Amino acid sequence: WVRIDVTADGVYALTRSRLRRMGFSNPDQVRLFGYGGYRQNEVIQADTDYDDLQEIPLFKQNDDTWLFWANGLLYWEGNTRVFNPYATKSCYFLTEGGEPATLETMAEVPASSSKFQISTFVDHILYEKDEYAWFSGGRNLYDGTSYASNNTHSYALTTTDSDGDESLTVAFSSGDKKSTAVLTNVNGQDVGTLSLGATSKYVYGTTSSATYSVGAHAQGNKWTIRLTSTAGNEARLDYLALHYRRRINVPSQVGYVAFSAPSYSKPSTFVIGGNPASLRLLRVDAPRCPSVLVSTQPLDGQSVSAVVEDPSARYVAFDVTHSFPEPTYVGEIENQDLHATDSLDMVII
């Protein structure tokens, strides 16, 4: 077993030469296992949760390169981020031998059953640095920059293929004995003020958040967020999240777009911008099958359509001609017999 790591969602490449350097004699027989770095459900359902590493079928880009979708450390439920505070890397594992899983194609859904046409989805731009704790406990960390000495800081965010409907979530924290106010300014316009309570004997830090509609202040794809807190108060940013409606296009810079339409529950048609000759579509959250191909039909020279049974699932459209990054090689993993280990107080897997 060889461990590889990623830190963010994305399409990653495994090349024949890299696999050989990892020690595999026959890269065509290499198999990929894992479920990435998303935080696992805190309530495990025996009927739906898989209790072992799942094999991920690889997409063969060419004779010397295989592609796969990797989950990073964070995902979204609506406009709420769900992050994994227990890991800094998302782990996958490679092995050689046996028959690698085949990347199957989902059964085609008749176009006549499609109820909606979907060409946009809600995307999120997150600014967050977990560098500081108000108390030596808990799992939420805060930005390393203190607002006590300089109570105004600016942050730059950039959207991709925005179709409007922007909103901004500001989450802030304070560790001061006096109450704190935080003014949010977006592209030169004040949009709202947060209020945070004071600390006390048993309260080491307070938090507050708010979401503001900011679409009226758009200036292209560039967003400057300026936060000003009560002068002299000890306070720190938790995170900024810019939510917006994004067109389903495959950008040339990264070569893929990941999307879903959770507000739709009936068969629908996705319209995806990209070169029909080189665009492929994966569903990456099918139960017990982490990756399956979805059939597409060319609409014109710049887009394709795909009729899907469940538009609320997660899909990834990617360009097979793009040069994708490789995961980080960590090393070989020795076999372990955890059942033979004694004197344990607690095990977290």
Placement of each model-derived feature along the sequence:
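Ligand-binding face of N-terminal immunoglobulin V-set domains in extracellular IgSF glycoproteins
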Residues: Y12
